[in-house]
Every structure is written in structure tokens, then in C-alpha cells.
């Protein structure tokens, strides 16, 4: 639920989007509300937040409506010679968004995913773990062996991205699977290139070789709800599948202390911690998810790292993974200081060998960092750009 304000009046709104939307949810963001139709007795709110203004454009929030856009304006553009479109097609125990049949009688099974996370020229999906998306992808890979032409269509709903990458930071299992089972759909007509040349083009662009065709297209929407297809083919980059499967990278841990306290921190002795927010920067070249989950536990663990002494006192703890090819924890520590964080001297930085720009890996903030747009933009820059640089 989102609480909107019209002047001094608070309006509770349903948000029909399963993502985390961390790039959008800041006070003062302009929403587009749609009054719920009469007769819906189960509705808990009178309005639905169907869109948000972001970078002077409208970003749709109603992810399910991507299917309607696909049916009306996208599918015929990306799959040639379609003559039949059947929505919500059931096959065995599974239901797929569309079954399409082309003029040659080829049966196309299609799943549509709305993509609203676009930063630094890179669109990513999903922005929260999606077991359902993984299940559909695995089913499509199996069905492709039975003669179906299988597709996943990512409908990018704002901005002008240069490429699409599966989001290995928030759902590495899905990202690895998409790279394994998928290939970038060929934007060139079949008569212009042989299958071999098309495959060479895909491989050169990191497009994968799996059986499921992966499409990314750009939909632009106005504040009246009217949409048009701005680009039928956005480059699909599946080259980071091995990184997604490696479970390696960096992380930030956001910790809230409700009260000021004195804490004994191993060899550092007793440290005075003010009430407020702290962010810890770390890395793991293997078992990244386990490392983060260990930090999030307050009990039942031996104290190995400095952070282990702090987390039992936390009111809230949040892990922010950043999959990466390189160790970036010192770079992240520098970023935290640049954002105004106050270092806790030598905390977590004993292996930095006294790096002058890295006095600590733990920084204090008076306000919640994830509520600071500059902090979120830094996180997204590392996820969309820096972490993916070799």
C-alpha cells in the first residue's frame, strides 16, 4: 500500500506491483491515481496507484497491464506473421500468458514480464526475487523440446535503456537460468541472415544459446494511460550468467540502532554507538548469499567479524547484495563517506592495511540511508554499471 497526499488529505492506495520499487518510493513523488470501479467489495482502498512520474516521464506501476499492451501492440511486431493470439493458455498444470499461432502453424508459447527498474541505461528484471518467473522459464525450456517456439518478453515501461540484463543482484537464480535457457531474440528478419550468422551476432553481444527466445521492448506511456511501442528490440545481454551462478560479490548491510549503547567489539575494545543508522561494506568471493544471511542473524553465531558484535543490538537489519567481478568493498566504503557517513574507526577495515581512503567499513548516518535518494542512486550505479565491469 502507498499513502498518497492531496494537499493535507491522506489517500491510501493499492500498488499493483510486486517489486520493491526502491528507485521510486521517496516522499514527494508524484503519483497517478485511478479510482477503483464500483462493485469491488473486497477492495481495501478506493484508489489504485497506476503510475508515477520519474525523470519527467510516466512510469506505469500496474504490472499486469503489460499483458494487454503485449496483446494489442507488441506481439505482432516481434513475432512475424502471427494469425492467432490466445491469452492465458493452459497446458497441463501450467498457464502461460499467450499461445500464438503463426501462418506456418508454428505454436508460440509466450510469457510477458513488466520491467520498471531502469538505471544508467540498463533495464533489469526482477527487482525482487520471483520464483514464479523462474518456474515459467524452466517450463518453457522443457516445452521447447516438444516443438513449441518459446519466448519471454520483457516490457520495459519507461526511460530509454540501451540494453536489458537479468537482475543477478536481487534474483541470481533467475538470472543464471535466463542465461542458461535463453537466447537474445534475433531482431534481424530471417531472410536477411542465416541461422548461423544470427547465432554469431547473438554470441558476440552476449546473447546466449539456450532454446527460449528472450525479447526486450520499450513501451512509452503518457499521463492519460495511452501507450505506444517506442522500440520493438532492445539489446538483451545474457553474458553475466556465470557471475550470477558464482554467488560472488559485495554487499552493504543497513543497521538501525534504536538506542545509544556501549558495545565490546573484539580487539577494538568498547565502542560508543549513537542511536541512528549504520551501513557496513563487505565482500565475499564465494557464498555471498550465505554471508549476508549470516550477518542478518542476531543470534546463534560465533563472533568472527566486527559486525558480529553489532548486529545483536540492531532493531532492524537489511542486506543489499551487489554481484561483481571485483572486490569493491573499499570503493563502497569511500562512497559511504562521500555520502556523509561518519566512520567508526578501524571497524571492519583491518585487512585494508591502513588504506588512507578507507578508515573504516562501518559508517554512521543520522537518517535512514535507503530513504536517501543519493544513497539509492549509488547502490543502483554499482549494480547496473560498476559491479558488471570486469
Task: Identify the role of each PLM range.
Residues 1-2:
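Short aromatic-glycine-enriched beta-strand elements
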Residues 22, 55-87:
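Acidic-basic catalytic patches of nuclease active cores, encompassing PD-(D/E)XK
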Residues 9-23:
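Beta-strand/loop nucleic-acid-binding surfaces
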Residues 242-243, 286-375:
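Aromatic/basic micro-patches that form nucleic-acid/chromatin recognition or nuclease catalytic surfaces
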Residues 235-297, 321-324, 367-390:
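GIY-YIG nuclease catalytic motif and its immediate N-terminal context
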Residues 27-40:
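Flexible glycine-rich surface loops and low-complexity tracts that mediate binding to linear polymers
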Residues 144, 150, 155-157, 162-247:
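Non-catalytic C-terminal interaction segments of nucleic acid-processing enzymes
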Residues 70, 96-127, 140:
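Conserved catalytic cores of phosphodiester-cleaving nucleases, focusing on short active-site segments
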Amino acid at each position: 500500500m502507498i499513502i498518497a497526499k492531496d494537499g493535507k488529505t491522506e489517500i491510501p492506495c493499492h500498488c499493483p506491483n510486486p517489486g520493491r520499487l526502491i528507485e521510486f518510493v521517496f516522499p514527494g513523488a508524484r503519483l497517478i491515481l485511478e479510482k477503483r470501479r464500483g462493485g469491488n467489495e473486497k477492495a481495501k482502498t478506493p484508489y489504485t496507484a497506476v503510475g508515477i512520474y520519474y525523470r519527467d516521464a510516466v512510469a506505469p506501476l500496474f504490472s499486469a497491464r503489460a499483458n494487454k499492451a503485449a496483446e494489442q501492440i507488441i506481439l505482432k511486431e516481434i513475432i512475424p506473421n502471427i494469425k492467432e493470439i490466445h491469452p492465458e493458455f493452459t497446458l497441463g498444470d501450467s498457464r502461460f500468458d499467450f499461445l500464438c499461432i503463426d501462418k506456418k502453424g508454428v505454436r508460440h508459447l509466450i510469457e510477458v514480464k513488466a520491467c520498471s527498474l531502469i538505471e544508467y541505461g540498463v533495464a533489469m528484471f526482477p527487482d525482487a526475487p520471483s520464483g514464479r518467473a523462474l518456474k515459467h522459464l524452466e517450463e518453457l525450456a522443457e516445452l521447447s523440446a516438444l516443438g513449441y517456439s518459446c519466448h519471454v518478453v520483457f516490457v520495459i515501461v519507461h526511460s530509454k535503456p540501451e540494453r536489458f540484463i537479468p537482475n543477478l543482484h536481487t534474483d541470481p537464480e533467475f538470472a543464471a537460468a535466463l542465461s542458461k535457457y535463453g537466447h537474445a531474440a534475433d531482431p534481424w528478419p530471417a531472410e536477411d541472415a542465416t541461422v548461423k550468422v544470427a547465432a554469431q551476432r547473438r554470441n558476440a553481444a552476449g546473447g546466449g544459446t539456450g532454446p527460449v527466445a528472450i525479447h526486450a521492448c520499450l513501451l512509452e506511456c503518457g499521463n492519460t494511460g495511452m501507450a505506444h511501442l517506442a522500440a520493438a528490440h532492445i539489446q538483451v545481454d545474457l553474458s553475466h550468467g556465470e557471475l550470477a551462478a558464482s554467488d560472488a560479490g559485495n554487499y552493504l548491510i543497513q543497521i538501525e540502532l534504536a538506542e545509544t549503547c556501549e558495545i565490546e567489539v573484539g580487539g577494538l575494545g568498547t565502542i560508543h554507538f549513537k542511536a541512528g543508522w549504520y551501513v557496513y561494506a563487505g565482500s565475499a568471493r564465494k557464498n555471498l548469499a550465505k554471508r549476508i544471511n549470516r550477518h542478518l542473524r542476531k543470534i546463534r553465531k560465533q563472533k568472527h567479524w566486527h559486525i558480529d558484535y553489532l548486529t545483536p543490538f540492531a532493531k532492524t537489519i537489511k542486506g543489499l547484495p551487489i554481484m561483481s567481478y571485483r572486490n569493491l568493498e573499499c570503493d563502497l566504503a569511500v562512497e559511504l563517506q562521500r555520502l556523509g557517513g561518519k566512520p567508526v574507526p578501524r571497524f571492519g577495515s583491518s585487512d585494508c592495511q591502513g588504506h588512507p581512503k578507507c578508515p573504516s567499513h562501518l559508517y554512521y548516518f543520522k537518517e535512514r540511508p535507503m530513504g536517501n535518494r543519493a544513497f539509492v542512486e549509488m547502490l543502483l550505479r554499482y549494480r547496473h554499471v560498476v559491479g558488471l565491469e570486469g
